[in-house]
Amino acid sequence: MTSRPQIHVHDAKEANKQTATKLTLPAVFTAPIRTDIVHKVFTDLNKNRKQASGVKISTRGTAGMGHSAESWGTGRAVARIPRVGGSGTHRSGQAAFGNQCRKGRMFAPLKTYRRVHRRVNVNQKRHAVAAALAASALVPLVFARGHRISNVQELPYVFDDSVESYEKTKQAVAFLKRVGAYDDVLRVAETKALRAGQGKLRNRRYKLRRGPLVVYGNEKSTLTRALRNIPGVDVCNVNRLNLLQLAPGGHVGRFIIWTESAFKKLNEIFGTYSTTGVQKSGYQLQRPLLANADIARIINSNEVQSVVKVAGTTETHERKKNPLTNNNALFKLNPAAKIVKEQAKKAAEASKAKRQATLKANRKAAKTHKKGSQAWIAAFNKANEEAIAKARQEDADFIAQGQEIKEGDE
């Protein structure tokens, strides 16, 4: 909550100038910020803008049901879904009506008498509005919501009632530039983008972020005409504060610019912690659960520390460990066991090294034997080939000699 008891009223005609008027901070700005209530109320109220919609129903029947189709029944090795009758066209024999069918209806068609709107308790709405107003006075929350308020003098930002006489947009733009709020308008203008989906065909073609909210008090003010064409800037009468504008999206911390007359009416509308609101009959502001939110200061105070129980000593028990499975317990009982295990480990490592050396020598001998075997086989094959070639040559010579003898006899 804010801690400043008084708020300065700024001059709307000159930059960074305060008037002599100071206003007491309305009690609604010290209300507890219940984001859970704000989110719940916003979710329900946002549904009330919806229009009844559903599947088209005409004299020919509901959408997807305008066919003359009957099931073929069993015995044809096809599904028992209704099928279009007739012949001579592709449509004949095709399935109809079902949600899994082409040109069929949807599953559980939407009705126009669905429960779309939600009823919200009056006091719940009032608590949500009070929480949103309290959050708008905290600079960190306004910054966290994305508003650019680096050039803003203070929050809440209050100006004299000369603002309510503006009629032209150029007057409003000049005013926003003077008071340092035009940076937020430029941020909004940069976010303008084409809407995805069918909304772009339904007069919702573009979407953009929300900028400052200007709250005025005079019902006959022309300020609405001056601000209505500036992107992201909303205007609201203090008598009709709306949570949809105070916390768009259910997120508290909107940047609000007040006129003096509107700011003075807040205690009359919402009341204080001791009196009820006049316009909101019987409404009482929620009281914070903690008057001081500094938990560390509360805990360390003398009142709390004097009744805090002194920390006692806790009994500790040594955990029993099995020496057969836990080496540390075994070494504690038998220190010689550590030496035995180390000797066994060294013996195992020596045995492993010996095996590795033997294996390496055997592999080397096998490799040498393999090379010798391959050399002997190559020599044997070469000698065998030479013997075969020699035998073939002798056979050829013998045959040639026989042919010569035969020719000589003839």
From Swiss-Prot:
GO CC annotation, single: cytoplasm
Entry keyword Calcium: no
Family of this protein: Belongs to the universal ribosomal protein uL4 family.
InterPro entries (UniProt xref): Ribos_uL4_C_dom, Ribosomal_uL4, Ribosomal_uL4_dom_sf, Ribosomal_uL4_euk/arc_CS, Ribosomal_uL4_euk/arch
GO MF annotations in UniProt: structural constituent of ribosome
Name of the protein described by the UniProt record: Large ribosomal subunit protein uL4
Keywords in alphabetical order: Cytoplasm, Ribonucleoprotein, Ribosomal protein
PROSITE patterns: RIBOSOMAL_L1E (PS00939)
